[in-house]
Amino acid sequence: MQGDGVRELLAAAREMGCDYLENEPMRLHTTFKIGGPARVLLFPETEEQITALVQCARANSVRLLTIGNGSNLLVSDKGIDAAVLVMDKHFSAVTVKGDTIFAQAGASLMKVCRTALEHSLTGLEFAYGIPGSCGGAAFMNAGAYGGEMKDVLVRCTHIDGDGKSGQLADRKSVV
C-alpha cells in the first residue's frame, strides 16, 4: 500500500476525530480468532466520516475494505495490506416503525431477530443463529433453513466506492 496515501488517510482520520489502529492483528477482530495485521483499522462514528474516509482513500490510491463483526472472515497470517473500515457499535442501531425494522450495517443479525420477536414481526426466523452483521448479511445474501436476506430486505442505503450515498430498493437495482 502506498505509504504517502496511508499517511494522508491517517491525517484525515485524526482531523475528523476518527479512531484508528495501525498494524492491528486481525485475529482480535474475527470470530475465528485468526489473521495477521491490517495496515490500518478505521473506526468511523458517523456516515460523514465514512464518506470522507472513502473519498480520501480513493483520492490517495489506498485499498479500502469494510468489515462488520468479523464473522465468516478468514484472514491470512500475513495480514491485510489495506485500510479496513470497521462497522461496529457506532453503526448498530435497530429501530422499528410499524411493521418495518431499520438496522444499521454493524447491527448483529441476532439483535435484529430479537427485535423482530419483541415486536411480533415475522420473516427473519431463518436468520436467528447466523453470526454476523446486517451489512455483511445483506452484502452476501446470508441465509439458512430456506430463507435468505433477499426475501426480507426491502431497501438498503449504502456508500459506494466514490463515497456517494445511494439506495438499492429491489434486486433490479443491483443487476
Segments the model singles out, each with a brief description of its role:
Residues 21-23, 65-68, 75, 96, ...:
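General beta-strand structural signal in soluble alpha/beta enzymes
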Residues 35, 42-47, 74-92, 139-169:
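Structural signature of FAD isoalloxazine-binding scaffolds in flavoprotein oxidoreductases
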Residues 110-119, 123-154, 160:
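A gly/ser-rich beta-alpha-beta helix-loop segment of oxidoreductase catalytic cores
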